[in-house]
Amino acid sequence: SNHPLGGQDGVALGYILGKHYNGNVRYLVNDLLMNLHGLAPLCIPINKTGSQSRDFPKMVEAGFASDNHIIMFPAGLCSRRQGGEIKDLEWKKTFVTKSIETHRDVVPLHFEGRNSDFFYNLANICKALGINFNIAMLYLADEMLKNRHKTFTLTIGKPIPWQTFDKTKTPAQWAQF
């Protein structure tokens, strides 16, 4: 899925897909979210904030080997304003390589939504100043509050068979396709 909001979209996807799949969903998430103890059992952490734990890669492999449906945001960060347009950053190839490795189909999801201008301006200022830490991430809780009582649209695409990701393109090219 795309990741326009950085919080509410993930919670909404988990709720909708969790109901449909009897709770058999897991999120591939920023390791910082492991500090939210109520959410942690549903999460497979990916290092974004510090040194990589030796257990994280094993947890990712176990998650993909399980019967759980994996919710992931291939850009790795929530959407940013680029050239005046709100869009995801470049998607990483992980969802393609894991689809091939584990023979899992990919179901594309599109979540319609946006954060405040403050959020996007802060993210762009930090990028322009060369600040590597994702300061904008610290404001995602505020963004959730700003978006309460709003309605969002989720579009669920047709499953893409894992066999689609053949050798005519690299996994990185498939991710951008």
Predicted segments with their positions:
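Catalytic core of membrane glycerolipid acyltransferases/transacylases, capturing the structured
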Residues: S1-S51
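Non-catalytic C-terminal accessory region of glycerolipid acyltransferases
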Residues: R54-F177
